[in-house]
Amino acid sequence: EMVVVECSAGTTPAAAVAQVVDEETAAVLIQNPNFFGNVEDVTLISEIAHAQGALLVCSVDPISLGILQRPGDAGVDIVVAEGQSLGTPLLYGGPYLGIMACRESFVRRLPGRIAGETVDRDDKQCWVLTLQTREQHIRREKATSNICTNQGLFALRAAIYLSLMGPQGMQDVANLCTQKAHYAAEQLTQHDRFELAFSDGFFKEFVVRDTQNDVQQLLQQACENNILAGLPLGQWYDELEDCL
């Protein structure tokens, strides 16, 4: 059974999470930054989940980790992400690569193969297949994962991107994304027609309210001027029908 906690106020309300999480809850899944682009209090949600013996799974934007708290430091047990932003163009929707990491106690439950760092006989850094299930080779139909060539190539592309950027480069990119998003929000809200829907801190995306309450007409005008304005949120949230 899956229970959804609404976050139409901008971020996930901790009190609402506490009401639905109990000793029978297997895991809590949260996205950070969330669908609205706002930054969640992951540490607080982690405390609520762990107090009931549940795991915390977090879906993240890899670029945001250049400036946001590391998921592990916030108490996250399993982290997943879409890796497209790590050096891969949009490519009309794919192929991309998925990212998954976990605490060491769960490593043997991860699908696929686990590569580990070691040294060779000349004390040079190298990588080896540390863990892999027999099914990967002898019973492919029962294997937990089969990574195809496309995903392998894009994983290599992401590895090259990360090695070139380095920690400081990732921080710079994350800061640039945030600065440009906040600049865009500042410029839009100088117009009487627009205002920010939420006061929460945001990373890339942000929600704008159309004070004239004519989102569809606004989107049509933007399209005619070759502008991809955003998603009309009323299709998911009735209370945000004037937002995008």
Identify the meaning behind each predicted range:
Residues E1-V128, R193, V208, Q212, ...:
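Conserved PLP-enzyme active-site core in the AAT-like
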Residues L86-D192, L196-S199:
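Active-site C-terminal subdomain of aminotransferase-like
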